[in-house]
Amino acid sequence: MPPSPLDDRVVVALSRPVRPQDLNLCLDSSYLGSANPGSNSHPPVIATTVVSLKAANLTYMPSSSGSARSLNCGCSSASCCTVATYDKDNQAQTQAIAAGTTTTAIGTSTTCPANQMVNNNENTGSLSPSSGVGSPVSGTPKQLASIKIIYPNDLAKKMTKCSKSHLPSQGPVIIDCRPFMEYNKSHIQGAVHINCADKISRRRLQQGKITVLDLISCREGKDSFKRIFSKEIIVYDENTNEPSRVMPSQPLHIVLESLKREGKEPLVLKGGLSSFKQNHENLCDNSLQLQECREVGGGASAASSLLPQPIPTTPDIENAELTPILPFLFLGNEQDAQDLDTMQRLNIGYVINVTTHLPLYHYEKGLFNYKRLPATDSNKQNLRQYFEEAFEFIEEAHQCGKGLLIHCQAGVSRSATIVIAYLMKHTRMTMTDAYKFVKGKRPIISPNLNFMGQLLEFEEDLNNGVTPRILTPKLMGVETVV
């Protein structure tokens, strides 16, 4: 059977099956011409079919390389072009919604000016297999050009006003789009971090599979973002001045596009954090390490007078040695877990491995009691779920008169977080006091901001009695007054 002229058509999603009698088909013979079939330079034009579709919604469908599609709707008509199944995740990519009757011109020849044969009084939009519906794609530079900016001084005034009125909840929601490590080092006070630096998160956010709320890591940030119905939303990165010039692949563009899709009207901080910090550094939060340097005056001599060792500008993580935090509690890295001689010399009989991938070294020898806490050093890892399990294992080692080594990859973030939490549990130390105590013993520690937030939540539960402290017997080796 010869192929139907409708076999070469654009697939659209219609509200109901299209029957042949619903289509206004006309064959324009004016383009048949007197072309010589044997000529190589002028291929013959067989026909041009103009199809007038009366539909309220036209949805661009993914290409054939995308998700599987079916044109079989159960209709007995071979001309039915209803799409029975399609990828719902692509519905939000491009849509053309007409208030009245939408007339679409479809041509089987790209050389045919088919739109000239459509009534000029009707709203016309061209369709092609490559371009889809003739409507602007969400997130184009034209749309981002309409996003307003806010100057650093204006944001500072808003923040100061809310602070003086003691109503911080009425202030704007501030979103930081920079990489997580940069946010960890410094950010505007009260800003929540959106983690869309990885390709998977960016793609899911662009496709509408997740929202900006899903990418906020801390609980306080989520709660604040849920209450933004009447709030301003201010988004910033490192140094953007013109939102219209932001590339579509940049996190700032993706976040703005997602917020616009949710019906929000975000503002962009002109010049980003770099510009804001120049005149308003007092309204920025820095990491605890930077705060400590300021507290001691920033000088190396002052720092060395308060801490056993000065905090280096770039910690020598690779050459860090096994660190005794308490007489029976040691904090180390992967190399320390392999050093059998040192572990036996220090009477270590228990080991906590806070990784998902490092092996349990010397496990087959039966010399140590092991516990693995499968955790990654990421802004999405829930490390607090392992606190009590780790505490019980540490106490078991303590009661048996054995030392315990807790380690992760480098002994910087994951294992350090659990040690800090253990000190908070068994003393009256605040999170900051416990952090500084461990930092004084092992200067390279630097829990990521996600873990610091979990420690703050843990401190709140300890203070409120939700999680009881264990103060007896008193820990030996805690020299500070707590």
From Swiss-Prot:
Its EC number is 3.1.3.16, 3.1.3.48. Residues 199-215 are annotated as: Interaction with MAP kinases. Disulfide bonds: none annotated. It catalyses: O-phospho-L-tyrosyl-[protein] + H2O = L-tyrosyl-[protein] + phosphate; O-phospho-L-seryl-[protein] + H2O = L-seryl-[protein] + phosphate; O-phospho-L-threonyl-[protein] + H2O = L-threonyl-[protein] + phosphate. Residues 168-285 form the Rhodanese domain. It is an enzyme of class 3 (hydrolase). Keywords: Cytoplasm, Hydrolase, Nucleus, Protein phosphatase. This is Dual specificity protein phosphatase 10.
